[in-house]
Amino acid sequence: MELIASLIVVPVVAALLLLVIKNDRARDAIAIAFAALIAVLSIAFAVVFAGPGTYEFALPAEWGHPLSLVNLAIDLTVAIFVVCYAVRYKRPFALGLAALQIVVALWFEFAVQAGAEFSMTMRVDALGVIMVLIIGIVGSGICVYALGYMKDFQAHELHENPQARDRRPWFFAIMFAFLSAMFNIVLVDNMAWMYTAWEVTTLCSFLLIGFTKSEEAINNAFRQIVMNLLGGVAFQFSLVYLGVFGLPLSFSMFVELGAAFPALVMLPVTLLAFAGITKAAQMPFHTWLLGAMVAPTPTSALLHSSTMVKAGVFLLVKLSPIFAVSLVPSVMVVLVGGLTFALCSFMAISQSNAKRVLAYSTIANLGLITACAGVGTPEAVWAAILLIIFHAVAKSLLFLCVGTAEHHIGSRNIEDMDLLFERMPRLARFMMLGIMCMFVAPFGMLIAKWATLVSFVETGNVALIILLAFGSAATFMFWAKWLGKLSGIAGEPQNVEL
């Protein structure tokens, strides 16, 4: 239990310290120290809880009511933040959704759950261990990379506007708070507390995407928050349904009940699946993740690899035992995921902006994970988990490489990366490694897609197999194109007309 508490509390402490410290050297030292500590804690967590089986840790019953009030306070704080920003920037839709969340949160606490026991249990399983490693190692690594990147970013801001305020303390505080919220999502068993962490990630993403405060950044930040608030409202109403009908708020008990009596939980499962689809940026909600590319590169890397979108597919994978026996939500999830994978893979071919290629690739791979979760068989679930692991590692590397290349060559356009192997050989090698990890044998993504194909074949669903085949062909095309741009080497000019 101490390890779990440390994983949740340590990033919060780091966020608070980084929020008040203005000195560059002190900020660097604290961020690196806490990032290293989070990574070490994640590895220690994996060592302790590795292996089959699940572990549950319940907090004392007398903590239930205070924790319930803390939970409500965080819910209201997040919603009020959104209301304030929506009023400031005159966004009525975001204002309406946030106001609705406030009303539902109060109703749920003081009417639906009035007098009910608030049980706070932490649950660790194999998927939770994998997610902790991804969040703790990849996420903290991105935070360290952001130190150098944001120094250059601030220097550029000062060059453009000598009066520009240094907002890096906010940036790093939000980054570390993001990690804490993600640890909450993957480790907590209480669905009300999971919802709270879910909405915290939505707010953190909003603040990071709109960090530059340009008109484009603000528009894309509100697009993100509106789409994810729709999912948040769906999540809330699933909790209300469970409370009204006396069904368990324990996620593990809910999944067991749904697997045994799928008709009983069809509505809340469908609502939760909708929440997962919006968070995972699946069509037609994919545009918020494309818009997130206006944010600084560390934000893009964090959103795509270890946080936010991974929360969406994590929820869907956790619900997979119910999808395996419940036709309606299963068909919805499989259809959305399969079409997203195929269509976004083809959309990526037409892109020359490296970050947009990575964004479409991320959405496509999340679609494949979503489809696997919707199938719900053990083979499909393990294929989804493999995709989550290998995609997180490769995509974080690629985003960081693209950000570094943009700083040095002044462009993120793939067409401008000709002869990058000669100009920046070390960076080009890392970028090529990341690209090959996405589609070349013997790297993990190819193995994961093979596992996906096997699981789809076993379902007998021909449409799924066709979508996988066409999407994979498109994937090969845009990665091979990018790889070719990087690997070109200039030679001596030769007259071929002689």
Name each model feature, range by range.
Residues 2-6, 13-173, 246-260, 287, ...:
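Transmembrane helix-loop-helix hairpins at membrane boundaries of multipass inner-membrane proteins
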Residues 140-194, 204-497:
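Hydrophobic transmembrane alpha-helices and their helix-loop junctions in integral membrane proteins
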